[in-house]
A protein has these predicted regions:
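Conserved alpha-helical scaffold segments that buttress catalytic/binding sites
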Residues: 1-239
Length: 239
Protein backbone atom coordinates (compact mmCIF):
# COMPACT_ATOMS: atom_id res chain seq x y z
CA UNK A 1 0.00 0.00 0.00
CA UNK A 2 0.92 3.66 0.20
CA UNK A 3 3.97 4.76 2.17
CA UNK A 4 3.09 7.09 5.04
CA UNK A 5 5.41 10.10 5.00
CA UNK A 6 5.81 12.90 7.51
CA UNK A 7 6.26 15.89 5.21
CA UNK A 8 7.67 17.94 8.05
CA UNK A 9 10.77 15.71 8.07
CA UNK A 10 11.85 15.13 4.46
CA UNK A 11 15.20 13.83 5.63
CA UNK A 12 13.40 10.66 6.77
CA UNK A 13 11.90 9.84 3.35
CA UNK A 14 14.67 7.45 2.32
CA UNK A 15 14.36 5.32 5.45
CA UNK A 16 10.55 5.40 5.42
CA UNK A 17 10.27 4.22 1.81
CA UNK A 18 13.05 1.67 2.23
CA UNK A 19 11.53 0.19 5.39
CA UNK A 20 8.12 -0.07 3.75
CA UNK A 21 9.59 -1.83 0.72
CA UNK A 22 11.53 -4.18 3.01
CA UNK A 23 8.34 -5.42 4.67
CA UNK A 24 6.91 -6.35 1.26
CA UNK A 25 10.02 -7.86 -0.32
CA UNK A 26 10.79 -9.94 2.76
CA UNK A 27 7.64 -11.91 1.98
CA UNK A 28 9.25 -13.18 -1.20
CA UNK A 29 7.10 -11.16 -3.55
CA UNK A 30 7.79 -8.60 -6.28
CA UNK A 31 7.14 -4.88 -6.08
CA UNK A 32 5.66 -2.48 -8.64
CA UNK A 33 5.78 1.08 -7.33
CA UNK A 34 4.21 4.30 -8.59
CA UNK A 35 5.44 7.85 -7.97
CA UNK A 36 5.73 10.62 -7.44
CA UNK A 37 9.15 12.17 -7.61
CA UNK A 38 11.78 9.99 -9.27
CA UNK A 39 13.95 10.11 -6.18
CA UNK A 40 11.70 7.36 -4.77
CA UNK A 41 13.69 4.90 -6.89
CA UNK A 42 16.77 5.34 -4.70
CA UNK A 43 15.32 3.85 -1.48
CA UNK A 44 13.54 1.19 -3.55
CA UNK A 45 16.87 0.15 -5.07
CA UNK A 46 18.44 0.02 -1.62
CA UNK A 47 15.71 -2.33 -0.47
CA UNK A 48 15.95 -4.61 -3.51
CA UNK A 49 19.75 -4.79 -3.28
CA UNK A 50 19.53 -6.28 0.22
CA UNK A 51 17.96 -9.36 -1.33
CA UNK A 52 19.44 -9.49 -4.82
CA UNK A 53 22.83 -7.82 -4.46
CA UNK A 54 24.16 -5.35 -7.06
CA UNK A 55 21.49 -4.57 -9.63
CA UNK A 56 21.35 -4.05 -13.39
CA UNK A 57 19.22 -0.95 -13.88
CA UNK A 58 17.12 -0.42 -16.99
CA UNK A 59 16.26 3.26 -16.84
CA UNK A 60 13.72 4.91 -19.16
CA UNK A 61 14.06 8.70 -18.96
CA UNK A 62 14.71 11.95 -20.79
CA UNK A 63 17.39 12.75 -18.19
CA UNK A 64 20.33 10.70 -16.92
CA UNK A 65 19.80 11.60 -13.23
CA UNK A 66 23.53 11.18 -12.59
CA UNK A 67 24.52 14.77 -11.83
CA UNK A 68 27.28 15.39 -9.34
CA UNK A 69 26.15 16.50 -5.88
CA UNK A 70 27.60 17.05 -2.43
CA UNK A 71 26.28 13.73 -1.11
CA UNK A 72 23.65 15.33 1.12
CA UNK A 73 20.93 16.26 -1.36
CA UNK A 74 17.60 14.45 -1.60
CA UNK A 75 17.18 15.03 -5.28
CA UNK A 76 15.79 13.38 -8.40
CA UNK A 77 18.75 14.53 -10.50
CA UNK A 78 21.59 12.66 -8.82
CA UNK A 79 20.25 9.52 -7.16
CA UNK A 80 21.58 7.05 -9.74
CA UNK A 81 25.10 8.39 -9.37
CA UNK A 82 24.73 7.89 -5.63
CA UNK A 83 23.36 4.37 -6.16
CA UNK A 84 26.31 3.51 -8.39
CA UNK A 85 28.87 4.87 -5.93
CA UNK A 86 27.27 2.85 -3.13
CA UNK A 87 27.44 -0.36 -5.18
CA UNK A 88 23.67 -0.70 -5.35
CA UNK A 89 23.60 -0.66 -9.16
CA UNK A 90 26.27 -1.75 -11.64
CA UNK A 91 26.62 0.96 -14.32
CA UNK A 92 28.43 -1.33 -16.77
CA UNK A 93 25.45 -3.71 -16.68
CA UNK A 94 22.82 -0.97 -16.79
CA UNK A 95 21.16 0.83 -19.69
CA UNK A 96 19.58 4.29 -19.84
CA UNK A 97 16.96 4.55 -22.59
CA UNK A 98 15.52 7.66 -24.23
CA UNK A 99 17.99 10.21 -22.89
CA UNK A 100 17.90 13.54 -24.72
CA UNK A 101 19.43 16.05 -22.32
CA UNK A 102 23.13 16.84 -21.97
CA UNK A 103 25.34 15.34 -19.29
CA UNK A 104 29.05 15.34 -20.09
CA UNK A 105 29.83 12.26 -17.98
CA UNK A 106 28.13 8.86 -18.32
CA UNK A 107 29.65 7.55 -15.06
CA UNK A 108 29.91 4.17 -16.76
CA UNK A 109 26.24 3.79 -17.67
CA UNK A 110 25.34 2.55 -21.14
CA UNK A 111 23.16 5.20 -22.80
CA UNK A 112 20.72 4.95 -25.69
CA UNK A 113 19.78 8.48 -26.68
CA UNK A 114 16.33 9.10 -28.09
CA UNK A 115 17.57 10.20 -31.55
CA UNK A 116 19.53 6.95 -31.87
CA UNK A 117 16.42 4.96 -30.99
CA UNK A 118 14.37 6.80 -33.58
CA UNK A 119 16.93 6.11 -36.31
CA UNK A 120 17.74 2.49 -35.42
CA UNK A 121 14.40 1.16 -34.18
CA UNK A 122 13.13 -0.92 -31.30
CA UNK A 123 14.74 -4.18 -32.45
CA UNK A 124 18.22 -2.66 -32.27
CA UNK A 125 17.44 -1.32 -28.80
CA UNK A 126 16.41 -4.78 -27.67
CA UNK A 127 19.60 -6.29 -29.09
CA UNK A 128 21.73 -3.65 -27.36
CA UNK A 129 20.06 -4.24 -24.00
CA UNK A 130 20.49 -8.01 -24.22
CA UNK A 131 24.16 -7.59 -25.11
CA UNK A 132 24.65 -5.65 -21.87
CA UNK A 133 22.26 -7.38 -19.46
CA UNK A 134 22.52 -11.14 -19.13
CA UNK A 135 19.68 -13.52 -18.13
CA UNK A 136 21.05 -14.13 -14.64
CA UNK A 137 21.55 -10.47 -13.73
CA UNK A 138 18.96 -9.07 -11.29
CA UNK A 139 17.15 -6.37 -13.29
CA UNK A 140 15.21 -3.44 -11.89
CA UNK A 141 13.24 -1.24 -14.31
CA UNK A 142 12.58 2.40 -13.54
CA UNK A 143 10.32 4.28 -15.95
CA UNK A 144 10.22 8.06 -15.77
CA UNK A 145 7.19 8.99 -17.84
CA UNK A 146 9.08 11.92 -19.37
CA UNK A 147 10.94 9.31 -21.39
CA UNK A 148 7.84 9.53 -23.57
CA UNK A 149 7.41 12.44 -25.93
CA UNK A 150 5.06 15.14 -24.55
CA UNK A 151 2.65 14.22 -27.35
CA UNK A 152 2.12 10.92 -25.51
CA UNK A 153 2.74 12.07 -21.93
CA UNK A 154 2.21 15.80 -21.36
CA UNK A 155 1.41 15.33 -17.68
CA UNK A 156 4.86 15.44 -16.16
CA UNK A 157 7.04 18.02 -14.45
CA UNK A 158 10.01 18.19 -16.84
CA UNK A 159 8.81 17.30 -20.36
CA UNK A 160 11.36 17.18 -23.19
CA UNK A 161 10.36 16.98 -26.85
CA UNK A 162 11.74 14.28 -29.13
CA UNK A 163 10.95 11.37 -26.85
CA UNK A 164 9.72 7.84 -27.36
CA UNK A 165 6.20 6.96 -28.41
CA UNK A 166 4.13 4.66 -26.25
CA UNK A 167 4.44 2.02 -28.98
CA UNK A 168 8.25 2.22 -28.87
CA UNK A 169 8.33 2.07 -25.07
CA UNK A 170 6.00 -0.92 -24.92
CA UNK A 171 7.97 -2.69 -27.65
CA UNK A 172 11.14 -2.36 -25.61
CA UNK A 173 9.42 -3.36 -22.37
CA UNK A 174 7.91 -6.49 -23.91
CA UNK A 175 11.38 -7.65 -25.00
CA UNK A 176 12.62 -7.71 -21.40
CA UNK A 177 10.49 -10.65 -20.30
CA UNK A 178 13.34 -13.15 -20.61
CA UNK A 179 15.48 -11.22 -18.13
CA UNK A 180 15.55 -11.70 -14.35
CA UNK A 181 13.08 -8.95 -13.46
CA UNK A 182 13.06 -8.17 -9.74
CA UNK A 183 11.03 -4.95 -9.56
CA UNK A 184 9.82 -1.82 -11.31
CA UNK A 185 8.65 1.69 -10.64
CA UNK A 186 6.79 4.22 -12.79
CA UNK A 187 7.29 7.82 -11.75
CA UNK A 188 6.85 11.54 -12.48
CA UNK A 189 3.19 11.35 -13.54
CA UNK A 190 1.54 14.72 -12.83
CA UNK A 191 -2.19 14.38 -13.62
CA UNK A 192 -2.86 18.08 -13.06
CA UNK A 193 -0.89 18.85 -16.23
CA UNK A 194 -2.95 16.53 -18.44
CA UNK A 195 -6.71 17.08 -18.51
CA UNK A 196 -7.19 14.26 -21.04
CA UNK A 197 -5.39 11.75 -18.77
CA UNK A 198 -3.36 10.20 -21.58
CA UNK A 199 -0.26 10.31 -19.36
CA UNK A 200 -2.00 8.29 -16.67
CA UNK A 201 -3.25 5.87 -19.30
CA UNK A 202 0.28 5.39 -20.61
CA UNK A 203 1.67 4.82 -17.11
CA UNK A 204 -1.10 2.39 -16.20
CA UNK A 205 -0.60 0.43 -19.42
CA UNK A 206 3.14 0.20 -18.85
CA UNK A 207 2.55 -1.07 -15.32
CA UNK A 208 -0.08 -3.53 -16.53
CA UNK A 209 2.22 -4.95 -19.20
CA UNK A 210 5.07 -5.31 -16.70
CA UNK A 211 2.80 -7.40 -14.48
CA UNK A 212 1.89 -9.45 -17.54
CA UNK A 213 5.58 -10.12 -18.15
CA UNK A 214 5.92 -11.43 -14.59
CA UNK A 215 2.83 -13.59 -14.97
CA UNK A 216 4.10 -15.00 -18.25
CA UNK A 217 7.39 -15.96 -16.60
CA UNK A 218 5.37 -17.91 -14.05
CA UNK A 219 3.91 -20.09 -16.78
CA UNK A 220 0.91 -18.18 -18.10
CA UNK A 221 0.02 -18.51 -21.76
CA UNK A 222 0.42 -16.23 -24.76
CA UNK A 223 -2.87 -14.51 -24.05
CA UNK A 224 -1.23 -12.54 -21.24
CA UNK A 225 0.47 -9.99 -23.49
CA UNK A 226 -1.90 -10.46 -26.40
CA UNK A 227 -3.90 -13.13 -28.11
CA UNK A 228 -1.72 -15.51 -30.06
CA UNK A 229 -2.76 -15.20 -33.68
CA UNK A 230 -2.71 -17.80 -36.38
CA UNK A 231 -0.63 -16.68 -39.36
CA UNK A 232 -3.81 -16.47 -41.42
CA UNK A 233 -5.16 -13.87 -39.00
CA UNK A 234 -2.21 -11.52 -39.40
CA UNK A 235 -2.36 -8.79 -42.02
CA UNK A 236 -5.14 -6.99 -43.86
CA UNK A 237 -8.54 -8.59 -44.03
CA UNK A 238 -10.33 -8.80 -47.36
CA UNK A 239 -14.02 -7.89 -47.33
Amino acid sequence: GDVWLDYGFPQNIVDEVEDHADTILEQGTSLLSFGGDHFVTYPLLRSHSKIHGPISLIHFDAHSDTWEDDGDRIDHGSMFLRAAREGIVVPEKSVQIGIRTQNNCTHGFNILHAPWIHSHGVQEVNKFVHDIVKPGDPVYITFDVDCLDPAFAPGTGTPVVGGLSTAQALGILHSLGDLNLIGMDIVEVAPAYDHAEITSLAAATIGHDYLCLLAKKEGAQERIIGTKLDEKQIGPTKV
